[in-house]
Amino acid sequence: MLVGGNSQARDLANTLLEGDYLANRNFAYSEKLGACDTTDLASLPEAALFRSADLILITIHVPGPDCTGAKLEQLRRLTKADIIFVGPKNFGWNMNPLGRVAMADRGKTLVDALPFITQRNDLMARKLPRGTYLDLMRLLGPDGRRLPAFDAGGNPLSQDREHFTKYGAVFASKPVADEIERLRR
């Protein structure tokens, strides 16, 4: 399995590690596999990884479907792997007020994602071919616009609005792993 992208990809890999999804898999990471990177993948030293992978996960933060679609076509020419683009997660503008949420209320506290993130996410979900997009906003939240701010124990899921804490990775690990397997069928 190969995970590609920026810090979002490293966050995804950590999420999969927390849930033991990677326990019996060969795993590699490449930052050269960004959703909108225009590098010719076949010319990279990592090309053998792309060819030998059975699953490629590429994280998307803000890019649109045009460059992502081009990346999908480039990869399809290079590999037989299942290719899944993993959409963004976003915990709003400002995490600071969440520190004042009472422990008893944390498990039901939701935060609004930034509108431009949800708009891009919706566009990607509509434009990418079926089975190639993992919509984190809809998977982890109730409506594609909001995400839980805390786990059931009141622990914060993000410290910086865009990446998971360890608690966030544990919270998301099973749903993300299950969705990857569902998309691969």
Q: What are the residue ranges of the model-derived segments?
A:
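Extracellular glycan-modifying ectodomains
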Residues: 1-185
